[in-house]
Regions:
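Short, solvent-exposed loop/turn segments at the edges of extracellular beta-sandwich modules
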Residues: 73-79, 168-176
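Surface-exposed, flexible coil segments in extracellular/virion-facing regions
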Residues: 35-61, 131-155
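Extracellular recognition modules
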Residues: 33-35, 67-73, 128-130, 162-168
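Interdomain boundary/hinge segments at the C-termini of tandem beta-sandwich modules
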Residues: 86-92
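Short beta-strand segments of immunoglobulin-like
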Residues: 5-11, 101-106
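Solvent-exposed loop segments of extracellular immunoglobulin-like
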Residues: 24-36, 118-131
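A short beta-strand segment in extracellular, disulfide-stabilized domains
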Residues: 14-24, 109-118
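Proline-enriched interdomain boundary motifs that mark the N-terminal boundary
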Residues: 1-7, 92-99
């Protein structure tokens, strides 16, 4: 049989890689039942209602580590085989805790410094500030050299500009937050 993915680390509420079992040999029709466990073991797990296919999509809404395994039973002879354990680690999604504040400034005046802060990021963060002519975090233009948690926008152009910062993390399954 082909075992499910050994370990995956994911960001909370992200899309996981499906766990899939392929069984070779035997007689009759295979039936599948997936189990969840709080320990790295194929005994004592909790049956997952409705998880009766060769493929199972582990949930990612709750932070923590869960262990999954599948018991495959052949109907005609009553034999069964249990897969190896698949570990699914869900890490807390990063979130912006300090957003840049809006402000109005006269041309050639001194604008307020824009600052961002975050929680739950894993790894070394990198920052990239963007400007946009619309109030959106899509389609902005990366500002050259604006790669720290704070940015001092220029006040040399009349009109409205919107700024936002993308924080990217080097590891932990959670890559970025706006």
């Amino acid at each position: 049989d082909t075992q499910a993915l050994a370990t995956q680390t994911l960001c909370q509420s992200s899309t996981p890689t499906n766990l899939t079992i392929t069984v070779y040999g035997g007689i009759g029709t295979n039936s599948y039942q997936w189990y969840r466990n709080t320990t790295n073991s194929t005994t004592g797990g909790t049956l997952i209602a409705g998880a009766t296919n060769a493929t199972f999509t582990p949930p990612t809404a709750t932070v923590g580590t869960q262990y999954y395994y599948c018991v495959v039973t052949q109907s005609s002879v009553g034999c069964n085989v249990t897969s190896a354990v698949s570990t699914v680690i869900i890490v807390a999604a990063p979130a912006i805790t300090t957003q840049p504040a809006s402000s109005s400034v006269c041309e050639n005046g001194t604008p307020a410094i824009l600052t961002v802060a975050y929680t739950n990021g894993t790894g070394t963060p990198t920052y990239q500030w963007f400007s946009n002519t619309t109030n959106s975090t899509i389609g902005g233009t990366a500002i050259a050299g604006a790669t720290t948690a704070s940015y001092s926008p220029p006040a040399t152009t009349v009109g409205t500009l919107y700024y936002y910062c993308e924080i990217t993390f080097s590891s932990g399954g959670c890559t970025s937050v706006l």
